[in-house]
Amino acid sequence: MVAAMAFPAAATYPTHFQGGALHLGRTDHCLFGFYPQTISSVNSRRASVSIKCQSTEPKTNGNILDNASNLLTNFLSGGSLGSMPTAEGSVSDLFGKPLFLSLYDWFLEHGGIYKLAFGPKAFVVISDPIIARHVLRENAFSYDKGVLAEILEPIMGKGLIPADLDTWKLRRRAITPAFHKLYLEAMVKVFSDCSEKMILKSEKLIREKETSSGEDTIELDLEAEFSSLALDIIGLSVFNYDFGSVTKESPVIKAVYGTLFEAEHRSTFYFPYWNFPPARWIVPRQRKFQSDLKIINDCLDGLIQNAKETRQETDVEKLQERDYTNLKDASLLRFLVDMRGVDIDDRQLRDDLMTMLIAGHETTAAVLTWAVFLLSQNPEKIRKAQAEIDAVLGQGPPTYESMKKLEYIRLIVVEVLRLFPQPPLLIRRTLKPETLPGGHKGEKEGHKVPKGTDIFISVYNLHRSPYFWDNPHDFEPERFLRTKESNGIEGWAGFDPSRSPGALYPNEIIADFAFLPFGGGPRKCIGDQFALMESTVALAMLFQKFDVELRGTPESVELVSGATIHAKNGMWCKLKRRSK
């Protein structure tokens, strides 16, 4: 998934935690998360944000700019949201640190639904699973992606993430059959083969280090390695194209990051100057964006044409029964091109592929990065993970069946997604007047919201809510094995792993929407099982061969919130062969 964002860039302050208190330093960021926002990381095992149900800070008088912003909001949009609690978006609060951290503070003060007032605009922020379920599942087609679609459309076109409802229904119906069981089974070998290249590269570097200096430890930016790995996997599994970025530099990945950065930039301006055609050639960054987009589009267009030239049209059922273990081209592109009864439109295929390229690449690289970060601070959990790896895999590569037995590794992946959700916010906009439920401790009659209201579902808040999680800031993969009662919370069914028998991972059904690692409802991420399996295989193969620790302290790792949450200066780690 890719997060949405909007509004001006400003100064933010990298944060670190001392004794549960938040302290600040300075860098640059954009308000809503696409443009880099930097904070120093949290040592999840030793420190956490102190939980408060109401603000204990005395109210202070805002400056002139703050007060003007609040008055303007109340005049123009405050009345339309009735008595909903209001978090007044002072300039200092909104631009002083990444938005999702401010949203968490206001959630603890105002509850599971509140209005974020900012200038002439007001946003509804949801941090309650009861309300999230209402929006994402029970009334899913009363909302579209709003500002997310506006920003991503120049890049992803009518792909699944930014698509309007009518287009989304058509494309979802076409793409969903491609993620069938035999395809996923075949992809485990792709995950394994690509991960093996990363492993062999690291082993070669260790041998060279031993030869040159006698040392058996190397230092690697694992975030960069995971980024290359994720690109190679997406290339082979979606396009049947080998980027080879684990072993060489890829111009395509540079272009991908260039397009993402432009999306970040567009979130920082009130005035969309890029919509004026001359800006494409006058403004240097817009010229670069057009160049990056052309590189990616040329690559995708070539792949689409190659696939169509060898098209073997057949029914969906027969496509799903192909021998994917021996198929030369088992990619999603091949499936979509060969599917009978589907109008093959090059532009729509390009949009679908671009969406999968960017969303799939970003999410996996971020999950693996933060998995290493959290595990490196918990050596006992590394030992437990390696014991499972040894028992299930031995020295061999994962298969589909053995991957399913790596239960603890999968729990690590989902716990990483709980603490570092990708993205931290889901964006929706009402298509008609709606009445949102009040949620836990909220108004019984709920809240009326008008058509066109922008809604932020804070996945970060849901995943760290003290009302629905025990020790919400701690890294505890084992938590997903336990049942949690609703504890009298009306409208929430609690956490019960048996609610979704056979599920590959704890999902929104098991947690009744308190856990949304891949969203929920009809517009849930279509590649959830793919992403979980990919991360499980890569993580297992890394710790099968190596012992890993951070190069510096956890506090030295700075967090950047862009399309996903990643490390500002990479995730530098020390690797050496496992000592058994």
Curated annotation (Swiss-Prot):
<keyword id="KW-0809">Transit peptide</keyword>
<keyword id="KW-0472">Membrane</keyword>
<dbReference type="GO" id="GO:0016705">
    <property type="term" value="F:oxidoreductase activity, acting on paired donors, with incorporation or reduction of molecular oxygen"/>
</dbReference>
<keyword id="KW-0125">Carotenoid biosynthesis</keyword>
<feature type="binding site" description="axial binding residue">
    <location>
        <position position="525"/>
    </location>
    <ligand>
        <name>heme</name>
    </ligand>
</feature>
<dbReference type="GO" id="GO:0004497">
    <property type="term" value="F:monooxygenase activity"/>
</dbReference>
<comment type="function">
    <text>Heme-containing cytochrome P450 probably involved in the biosynthesis of xanthophylls. Hydroxylates beta-rings of alpha-carotene. May also have activity on beta-rings of beta-carotene.</text>
</comment>
<keyword id="KW-0150">Chloroplast</keyword>
<keyword id="KW-0349">Heme</keyword>
<keyword id="KW-0408">Iron</keyword>
<comment type="similarity">
    <text>Belongs to the cytochrome P450 family.</text>
</comment>
<feature type="transit peptide" description="Chloroplast">
    <location>
        <begin position="1"/>
        <end position="52"/>
    </location>
</feature>
<dbReference type="InterPro" id="IPR017972">
    <property type="entry name" value="Cyt_P450_CS"/>
</dbReference>
<dbReference type="GO" id="GO:0016117">
    <property type="term" value="P:carotenoid biosynthetic process"/>
</dbReference>
<dbReference type="GO" id="GO:0005829">
    <property type="term" value="C:cytosol"/>
</dbReference>
<protein>
    <recommendedName>
        <fullName>Cytochrome P450 97B3, chloroplastic</fullName>
        <ecNumber>1.14.-.-</ecNumber>
    </recommendedName>
</protein>
<dbReference type="GO" id="GO:0005506">
    <property type="term" value="F:iron ion binding"/>
</dbReference>
<keyword id="KW-0503">Monooxygenase</keyword>
<dbReference type="InterPro" id="IPR050196">
    <property type="entry name" value="Cytochrome_P450_Monoox"/>
</dbReference>
<dbReference type="InterPro" id="IPR001128">
    <property type="entry name" value="Cyt_P450"/>
</dbReference>
<keyword id="KW-0479">Metal-binding</keyword>
<dbReference type="GO" id="GO:0009570">
    <property type="term" value="C:chloroplast stroma"/>
</dbReference>
<dbReference type="InterPro" id="IPR036396">
    <property type="entry name" value="Cyt_P450_sf"/>
</dbReference>
<dbReference type="GO" id="GO:0009941">
    <property type="term" value="C:chloroplast envelope"/>
</dbReference>
<dbReference type="GO" id="GO:0031969">
    <property type="term" value="C:chloroplast membrane"/>
</dbReference>
<dbReference type="Pfam" id="PF00067">
    <property type="entry name" value="p450"/>
</dbReference>
<keyword id="KW-0560">Oxidoreductase</keyword>
<dbReference type="InterPro" id="IPR002401">
    <property type="entry name" value="Cyt_P450_E_grp-I"/>
</dbReference>
<keyword id="KW-0934">Plastid</keyword>
<dbReference type="GO" id="GO:0020037">
    <property type="term" value="F:heme binding"/>
</dbReference>
<dbReference type="GO" id="GO:0009507">
    <property type="term" value="C:chloroplast"/>
</dbReference>
